[in-house]
Every structure is written in C-alpha cells, then in structure tokens.
Amino acid sequence: MPSNQSPLRIAALQLDLAWCDPAANFAKVRALCPAPGSVDVLLLPEAFSTGFATPRAREVAAWAPKAVEFLTKLAAEGGYAVGASVFVPHESGKVANRFYWIEPDGGTTTADKRHLFAVAGEHEDFARGTEAVVVTWRGWRLRLAVCFDLRFPAWLRNRLDANGQADYDGLLVVANWPEARENAWTTLLAARAMENQCYVAGVNRVGIDGFGVPHSGASRLIGPWGDLLAAADLNLEGYVTAEWDPIHLSLIHI
C-alpha cells in the first residue's frame, strides 16, 4: 500500500439518459451530482451526453467538445475526478467510444472501448481501443473500462510485478447495460473484483433508450472479495457511494 494512499470515496450516478440531447443530460447531471468535495471520484454512464445512439454515431461524435467541456467544468467545480464515456471522431474515420477521466485541475486521460458488440454492428462504425489504461488518483491506481469490456477477463487481468505490486487497485466500468442482461452485469462486476483482488465500481443507465430497450441501472460498488458495498435502487436516477479502504486491500494482497 503506498504511503500516500487514503480511503477513496466513490460515487456512481445512474441516469435516464435523454436520447441525443446533451443539454438535457447536462442538466440531469447538474441536478443529481454529489456536493462539491463530498467524494473523490464521480462516475457517469457510458455515452452520458447522448445515450448509446449508434445509428447517429458520427453525428453525435461531432458534439464531443461540448461534453468534454462540461465534464471539465464539473470536475473543477466539484473538486473530484469525473469519469464518463463520450462518442468522439476517430482518426480512422470511424468513431471511438472514449472513456474520459478528468481531474479538478483539468488533467485528462482517455481510454477507448476495446471490445465492440458485433451483434449490434458496433464494429461497422466504431474503432477498437488498443491500450489498457491505468490512472493514478490520490494514491490509487485505477483501471478504466467501458461496458462490454467487462466480459473479457484477460483484457482486465490485474498482474503483479516482481515486487508483488498489482497493476491497479480499482476497476472503473461505465456502461449502458440492458435490463435483460442485468444478471450478467452484476455477476461479472463481482467476478472481476474477486479474480483481480481489487475494488470495482460499475455505473449504468436507467430508463428506455432510443431503441426501446429498457435499462434497470443496477449500478454498484464492489469490494475485493466480491462483496457488495453499495447498490443503487433499480430503475431510479441517483447516485450511490462507498469508501474504498486501502488497508483492507493491502491485507487481501498479503
């Protein structure tokens, strides 16, 4: 455990995302986000500003600068790091589903979604991410992941170096995970925590999306033994919080 590692306060805010309406979604976040200084990290769902509007992916990707500007202001005003994904133009001519990690001073790290959901045709419009990204925040090493990446344990494997140091302490997952597969969502979050001996935060949307697909949320914060620390109410907007304990984590790694 690093000497500068203190408990980390995590908030996962599940939202009923307005379809292709960034202004409405920005207003929702403003109305429901934690008070300034009350947490260390705030997570928002995948494609938080537009919903998972894949048929209009290239169109909504052009709106990305406004979403990033909003996240930057939110982090600065809240005094916490903010994580969310946004559709952005990719150099290949396709679109990237990009996890933005933005700190209060404006420092920004990004990670593109690696695993595309071919059944829904994501591979036709989206470019795959190539890098496993870990950020360090207030002494914690945090791995960034987007939705379907959760299903791939090899991609998220937490390895130890020669000194027994793990790649990361916590896994952050932002998603638009359908209600029909809620059991897979909750099971996989716990599985990733247990197999990687790390904390896990999973944030999901609620409500019915533009395809008519319902989402129940089931956002949750998981301990390194797969134990449930906090769970959001199903089908309701709002955030759930928990504190991650570095001492507890260090004892598990012994």
Predicted segments, located by residue:
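Cys-nucleophile CN-hydrolase/nitrilase-fold catalytic domain and related Cys-dependent amidase chemistry
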Residues: 22-23, 30-104, 109, 178-192, ...
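N-terminal active-site segment of His-dependent metallophosphoesterases
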Residues: 1-41, 172
